Amino acid sequence: APNVTKLAYEIGTSRATVMNYIKDLEEARLVNLVYREGEEFPKKPVQIMIHNTNLLYAISSRNAEEQEVMETFFANSVWRHHSVSKGKRTGSYIIDGHNIVVCDKSRRFKAQDGVYFARYNAEVGHGTDIPLWLFGFLH
C-alpha cells in the first residue's frame, strides 16, 4: 500500500491533495487503483498499479519483475468490464466475487473451493487453472 502521509510530507502538501493527485492519475488512465472488496475512493488503495504493461516498460527505470508484469496484464485485461478488488494473498484478486490468483504455471497451491488460477507460462488450462493469455481476449 502506498504511504500517502509520507508522500504528502515529501512534496509539501496535504494527504487529501495527494489522494486527489492519485485519483487524477487514475482518471488519465496512467494507473489503476486497487482497493479491498467494498472499499473505494477516497479511502487509500491497497495497491497502485501502472495502467498497462506498455506504460510499465516505458516509464520504469528498472526491469519489472515477471509477477508484476503479469498482474498488470491481468488487471488491465479484466478492468474494463469487471469489478476488480485485491484479494488476501499475493497476486490474488477478487473479480466480480470470484477469487483469482495470478501465478506461474509451476507454482502449486492446495485445492481450494472457489479459487481460480490465472497461470502465466501456461498454454492450456485444466480444472481451475486458466492460461493468463486468455484474459487478453477480454480487453
Q: What label would you give each PLM region?
A:
Residues 1-90:
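Accessory nucleic acid-recognition modules appended to NTPase machines
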Residues 12, 79-82, 95-98, 109-116:
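Short glycine/proline-enriched coil/turn segments at helix->beta-strand junctions
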